[in-house]
Amino acid sequence: MKKLKLHGFNNLTKSLSFCIYDICYAKTAEERDGYIAYIDELYNANRLTEILSETCSIIGANILNIARQDYEPQGASVTILVSEEPVDPKLIDKTEHPGPLPETVVAHLDKSHICVHTYPESHPEGGLCTFRADIEVSTCGVISPLKALNYLIHQLESDIVTIDYRVRGFTRDINGMKHFIDHEINSIQNFMSDDMKALYDMVDVNVYQENIFHTKMLLKEFDLKHYMFHTRPEDLTDSEREEITAALWKEMREIYYGRNMPAV
């Protein structure tokens, strides 16, 4: 896409929001409580603040204010307001490619925010526990928040990820013509690294004319030991392993497809 010469500030709002899910099997009530306590501590407000602050560093944003809170009995939220500094538009990379992990992108944000909320969850029947984190990066200016996608998914190791990206508003060029998007995009997947794409099965649902892009990700490899909390698969009987594997896989598919599925 040819670079635009704008009249005034770039008024496009670009929003990236995604849910990540971590699934676990905890055999007893004590193990379920232990998992919730573990995941709640792992992703407490301080840790989330560190992750989001690094995200700001990656995309070149200046932090104006941080609001964070841990909740009882569990959960946390962090919201960061960020601002823009003058930047040479010639230095802005608008091509479709994966964003960096810890590297710096020369770009800045204005009237923008980054926020995360966590939702640990379990049920007394079945032993299944889930952890969900909702993250939103909303920017107003020249850079797309998709540059932060790679880093965030790597930091929050996930079994399932659902991602939405949308562009709203318009900006004008020097001739007064409106532009409703200022960069090329045909898939969120183009902003992911090859190693990430190798780990997940992915499907897109995009509405190009509305500048709405959606990608769902499901971890390809299933290893039962990674889903057990304080229980080793080798300590279970064959039938127990099969039953737990089926329950976990059903849970993951239901979350991935967003609907309840019949028992197989």
Curated annotation (Swiss-Prot):
Pfam family, one: AdoMet_dc
Keywords recorded for this protein, A-Z: Autocatalytic cleavage, Decarboxylase, Lyase, Polyamine biosynthesis, Pyruvate, S-adenosyl-L-methionine, Schiff base, Spermidine biosynthesis, Zymogen
Pathways per UniProt: Amine and polyamine biosynthesis; S-adenosylmethioninamine biosynthesis; S-adenosylmethioninamine from S-adenosyl-L-methionine: step 1/1
Group of enzyme by EC: lyase
Active site per database record: 112, 117, 140
Gene3D superfamilies in UniProt: S-adenosylmethionine decarboxylase
Site (Cleavage (non-hydrolytic)): 111-112
Cofactors required: pyruvate
Pyruvic acid (Ser) modified-residue sites: 112
A molecular function GO annotation: adenosylmethionine decarboxylase activity
GO biological process: spermidine biosynthetic process
EC numbers for this chain: 4.1.1.50
Keyword Lyase assigned: yes
GO terms under cellular component: cytosol
Cofactor binding summary note: Binds 1 pyruvoyl group covalently per subunit.
PTM section of the record: Is synthesized initially as an inactive proenzyme. Formation of the active enzyme involves a self-maturation process in which the active site pyruvoyl group is generated from an internal serine residue via an autocatalytic post-translational modification. Two non-identical subunits are generated from the proenzyme in this reaction, and the pyruvate is formed at the N-terminus of the alpha chain, which is derived from the carboxyl end of the proenzyme.
Keyword Transcription regulation in annotation: no
UniProt record similarity statement: Belongs to the prokaryotic AdoMetDC family. Type 2 subfamily.
Self-association and partners: Heterooctamer of four alpha and four beta chains arranged as a tetramer of alpha/beta heterodimers.
Function: Catalyzes the decarboxylation of S-adenosylmethionine to S-adenosylmethioninamine (dcAdoMet), the propylamine donor required for the synthesis of the polyamines spermine and spermidine from the diamine putrescine.
Official protein name in the record: S-adenosylmethionine decarboxylase proenzyme
Species: Escherichia fergusonii (strain ATCC 35469 / DSM 13698 / CCUG 18766 / IAM 14443 / JCM 21226 / LMG 7866 / NBRC 102419 / NCTC 12128 / CDC 0568-73)
